[in-house]
Swiss-Prot record:
This is Acyl transferase 4. The active site is at 166 (proton acceptor), 382 (proton acceptor). Keywords: Acyltransferase, Lignin biosynthesis, Transferase. One of its GO terms (molecular function) is hydroxycinnamoyltransferase activity. Grass-specific monolignol p-coumaroyl transferase involved in the biosynthesis of acylated monolignols or monolignol conjugates that serve as monomer precursors of lignin. Can synthesize sinapyl p-coumarate, p-coumaryl p-coumarate, sinapyl caffeate and p-coumaryl caffeate in vitro. Pfam families: Transferase. The keyword Secreted does not apply. The gene is AT4. It comes from the Eukaryota. Belongs to the plant acyltransferase family. It comes from Oryza sativa subsp. japonica. The lineage of its organism: Eukaryota, Viridiplantae, Streptophyta, Embryophyta, Tracheophyta. GO terms for biological process: lignin biosynthetic process.
């Protein structure tokens, strides 16, 4: 049975008041922002149940509330209302032109309730593309920092579909912006966290001569979504504490199990074959004291409102046999060791003490890339109807084995693993390995 979604209005939402820069001013991006691989679209759905608006007062439709709040937030976050422009060096020389043309906003209505589509839990009963904004006229999607669609359901619930360009903001920065929209939607006079541009504060070490562009082999990767129970996660945490005397996070456990399950499923012929894990660690706390870096403030994320890209790729390399044979606590240990190296590795990168650029990644089938969506602020965003029941990211690419750690829909607990990381030959074994974690 199909459920129709009808788009009822499309427009560019401009800042609702004058913004600081003069029209056409160009803002420089940081060396991390300008990593060519970040010039891509990040797509996600944010599902809000039919709970009554907080405060008890009758309110207009969610789409109208959010559209008005977006216009206010774009005054503070005016670069989101601009456009990316490339210099002579292509995407690697991009800047933001503060045109004030606005963010693309689409209003839509679904001819069903959220219950009719199982709360948009996995698997989706409405195609994701119906709930994400369609293309804006006259502008390339990769030049437009933000697109948003609000789809209202017959029950009063709604879905916010977001498409943003990673060049503007990392996950924490995007979450900070979305929470600012929520602050205005709930009637606040200003966002709880004031935005800071400060891209010049990010280290800019001399780049190595660029090598040839990476060869991107396309894989036939399959989607797998699985939930890890809170009980199983806590057991793994306890086992790690018993073995080491140290604590670990839910993220540590979830990626350890996912990496181990995938490695076992690959059945590499030699136990000495190398397998790789990569995740992206926030480095705002490592910027404290750097020139031009703003001091932390209450309610900030370690950078007093900095919303640009401020992360470092953390890599774990091990022999496949070691990953397969270890218990989950042992794999967690490998991950924790890599995390412990982060301050030193980031400091070396900042002063150009490296032989290979850590931001130039290699995409091979023996490499797994992991992203954590539980700590970005999206699960706390509130437009006046309470926080979302769950968030569904779509950060998948055919050349890149990916696992995203999220949260299952409330009231479920534990962790949700959303992956596109194995081909058909390895799919059954991967599913069985993931399932075995909860036995």
């Amino acid at each position: 049975m199909g459920f129709a979604v009808v788009r009822t209005n499309r427009e560019f939402v401009r800042p609702s008041a004058a913004t600081p820069p003069s029209s056409g001013e160009l803002l420089e991006l940081s060396i991390i922002d300008r990593v060519v691989g970040l010039r891509h679209l990040v797509r996600s759905l944010h599902i809000f149940s039919a709970a009554a608006p907080s405060g008890g007062d009758a309110k207009p439709s969610p789409a109208r509330v959010i559209k008005e709040a977006l216009g206010k937030a774009l005054v503070d976050y005016y670069p989101f209302a601009g456009r990316f422009v490339d210099g002579g060096g292509g995407p690697g020389s991009a800047r933001v032109e503060c045109t004030g043309e606005g963010a693309w906003f689409v209003e839509a209505a679904a001819g069903c309730s959220l219950d009719d589509v199982n709360g948009l839990d996995h698997p989706l009963m409405i195609p994701e593309d119906d709930l994400l904004p369609d293309a804006a006229p006259g502008v390339h999607p990769l030049d437009l920092p933000l697109m948003m669609q609000v789809t209202e359901f017959s029950c009063g619930g709604f879905v916010v579909g977001l498409i943003s360009v990673h060049t503007m903001a990392d996950g924490l920065g995007a979450g900070q912006f979305i929470n600012a929209v929520g602050d205005y939607a709930r009637g606040l006079d200003r966002p709880r966290v004031s935005p800071v541009w400060a891209r010049e504060a990010i280290p800019s070490p001399p780049k190595l001569p660029p090598g040839p562009p990476p060869e991107l082999k396309m894989f036939q990767l399959r989607h797998v979504t699985a939930d890890l129970s809170l009980d199983s996660i806590n057991k793994a945490k306890s086992a790690y504490f018993a073995a080491t005397g140290h604590r670990c996070s839910t993220f540590d456990v979830a990626i350890a199990k996912t990496w181990q399950a995938r490695t076992r499923a690959l059945r590499l012929p030699e136990p000495t074959s190398r397998v790789n894990l990569c995740f992206f660690a926030n480095t705002r706390h490592l910027m404290a004291g750097a020139a031009a870096w703003p001091a932390p403030a209450a309610g900030g994320n370690g950078g007093n409102g900095f919303y640009g890209n401020c992360f470092y790729p953390v890599s774990v390399v091990a022999e496949s046999g070691a990953v397969e044979a270890a218990d989950v606590a042992g794999v967690v240990g490998m991950i924790r060791e890599a995390k412990a190296r982060l301050p030193a590795d980031f400091a070396r990168w900042a002063v150009a003490d490296f032989r290979e650029d850590p931001y130039e990644l290699s995409f091979t089938y023996d490499s797994l890339f992991v992203s954590d969506w539980t700590r970005l602020g999206f699960l706390e965003a509130d437009y006046g109807w309470g926080p979302p029941s769950h968030v569904i990211p779509f950060a998948y690419y055919p050349f890149m084995a990916v696992a995203i750690i999220g949260a299952p829909p409330v009231p479920k607990t534990g962790a949700r693993i959303m992956t596109q990381c194995v081909e058909d030959d390895h799919l059954p074994a991967f599913k069985e390995e993931i399932k075995a974690f909860d036995k």
